[in-house]
Structure formats: C-alpha cells, structure tokens
C-alpha cells in the first residue's frame, strides 16, 4: 500500500493503516506456537480403569435409557433415614437421609478377564444415565433437586449402585390437638417424572422393606413410631400404561420433656391462679392484683402459641384452649 494522497487527512489515514498492519505482523510473529492436541501424549501410562472407562463412555448417551424400549429398567430403592425436622408453622416435614438406587445398565458391561480382572468401576453421577426419581408431594417449590453429588459404582454385570445423600421436603396434614404429646403421620411419594411403569419399574428392596433405620439420629426431637413402604401402580385416563410410585408412611411421636416444663407447668399455674381468684374474698385487694397477673400470663401464653404453632381450624391444641 502506497500513499499517493496529497491531502493531509488522507495521508494521515494511510499512515495509521500501515501502523496497524505492522503491529499485526509483529504480534503474529511473536506469538508462541500452539501445540496440536493430536500430537500430545499423556505423561503417564493408561491404567485398566482409564482404558475401560474410555471404551464404555465413548459415544455413550446419558440421556437415553440403557435398555430396549420393549424392556423395563427395574430400579430397586432403599431409603435410609437419618434425621427429621418438622416445621409446624409451615406444616412441612424435612427428611434427611440416603437414597440407595440400583439398576442394570446394558451399556456398561464388560468381561473381567479381558480387562485385567477389574471388578468395579467408579463413575461420576453426571456421566451415565440415572432414573429421574422425584418426590411427587414435594414442598420445595420449583426445585426438584433432592439428591447430592456422589459417584456411582458399576459392576461387570452392568449393575449400577448410586447412594446419594437426600433431602426431601413434604407437606403434612398436622393434628396438633394433643400437642405437645402429639403423634403425626406424613407421607413421601416417589416416582419417575417422565417414564411409565413399562419403562422404569420401581421396586422396594426385599431385604429391607425399602427403608433402613440403623443410622437414625436418636437425639432428634421426634421418635419414629412406625415406617411402612408401599409400591403402587396408578392408571390415568390419558394413558394405558401404569405409573409406578413408592410411598413411605412415617409416623412420628414428639418427645416432650422440655415442653412439659415450658408449657404444661405454666398452664397448671394459670389454672391454680384462676381458682385462687375465686377463693379470695370479694373485697380483697389481692384479688384484683391476682386476676391482673393471671390475664397477663394468659396473654403471654397465647403469644407463645401464636409464634410456635399454626392457626389451623379444628386443630387447636387443647392446652391452649384450656388456658
């Protein structure tokens, strides 16, 4: 490019363009060579695990169910309960535990003798297909992510075991009439979100009835009275295929030693103070003072209930009604 313009502005633009060209050539010549990924080799020798993982996961589609469409994928479930928290104001039960799910992946089979005797393979949960087991009666709003991140264990037969930590929030119909000596029953209903029973068949583990309590936190406010797991097939008018769900019926009894001191003792004191007001002579000055103190204590007592318990018609605690 040669600048033939006689005008000052044209000559300036031409020089500016030449400057950009020269700078581009300088940066291009000084930039380091980018190595070709195809020529790079790892600095370590591939293990049997590396080779097997590369073979199994190459062209693996984690969004495709690993079975023929005519065959159902059987998922065996075991829920290990660890801790319960009940929010009376929101009528929501929070369940903490582990969810054990086991199924067979036809795409993840191998012969041990051909792969150095490798008897298991650990894969990240996002690398392979997983059943979309969701809590149907969830109280967590738009979030349906019940499970934490954990690895899956795969065996040569194609069996996959996944045991993620789980947290479920479920609505409960609370009956607080006997509070704080109440017993509550809540239900967790789990099922596949997109697959029917002919595609994903949920089964309760026969050895544990679908749940375990060995790791239960015994220091919880609630004592587990009973847990039952039931499998059911639901049919809807839209479809001919069954939809399988698993329901855990949980019965909890409140442990109330602390509530006896906080609630029952003041309630008994209110009753005695009210009776004492009738026992005093009508013209006694202490009677007005005693009745005034009783009214203040009752107001504080009811204020405590309003902050602790929901205002539900037909479920008012008897201890609050008596006071």
Label each residue range with its predicted role.
Residues 1-9:
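N-terminal secretory signal peptides that target proteins for export/translocation
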Residues 10-12, 18-19, 25-292, 304-322:
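Non-transmembrane, solvent-exposed beta-strand/loop segments in proteins
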Residues 298-304:
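Aromatic-anchored segments of alpha-helical transmembrane domains
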């Amino acid at each position: 490019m040669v600048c033939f313009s006689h005008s000052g502005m044209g000559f300036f633009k031409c020089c500016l363009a030449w400057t950009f060209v020269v700078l581009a050539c300088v940066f291009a010549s000084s930039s380091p060579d980018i190595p070709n990924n195809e020529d790079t080799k790892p600095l370590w020798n591939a293990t049997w695990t590396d080779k097997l993982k590369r073979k199994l996961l190459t062209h693996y589609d984690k969004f495709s169910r690993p079975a023929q469409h005519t065959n159902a994928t059987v998922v065996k479930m075991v829920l290990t309960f660890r801790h319960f928290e009940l929010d009376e104001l929101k009528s929501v039960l929070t369940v903490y535990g582990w969810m054990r799910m086991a199924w067979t992946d036809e795409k993840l089979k191998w012969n041990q003798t051909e792969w150095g005797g490798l008897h298991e393979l650990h894969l990240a949960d996002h690398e392979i297909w997983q059943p979309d087991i969701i809590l149907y009666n969830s109280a967590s709003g738009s979030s349906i992510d019940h499970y934490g991140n954990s690895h899956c264990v795969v065996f040569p037969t194609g069996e996959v075991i996944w045991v993620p930590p789980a947290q479920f929030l479920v609505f409960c119909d609370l009956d607080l009439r006997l509070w704080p000596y109440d017993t509550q029953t809540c239900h967790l209903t789990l099922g596949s979100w997109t697959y029917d029973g002919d595609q994903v068949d949920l089964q309760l583990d026969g050895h544990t009835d679908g749940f375990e309590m060995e790791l239960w936190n015994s220091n919880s406010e609630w004592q587990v009275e009973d847990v039952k797991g039931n499998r059911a097939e639901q049919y809807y008018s839209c479809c001919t295929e069954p939809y399988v769900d698993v329901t855990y019926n949980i019965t909890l009894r409140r442990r109330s030693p602390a509530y006896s001191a906080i609630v029952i003792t003041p309630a008994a004191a209110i009753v005695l103070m009210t009776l004492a007001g009738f026992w005093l002579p009508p013209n006694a000055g202490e009677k007005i003072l005693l009745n005034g103190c009783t009214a203040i204590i009752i107001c504080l007592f009811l204020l405590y209930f309003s902050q602790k318990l929901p205002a539900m018609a037909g479920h008012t605690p008897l201890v609050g009604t008596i006071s």
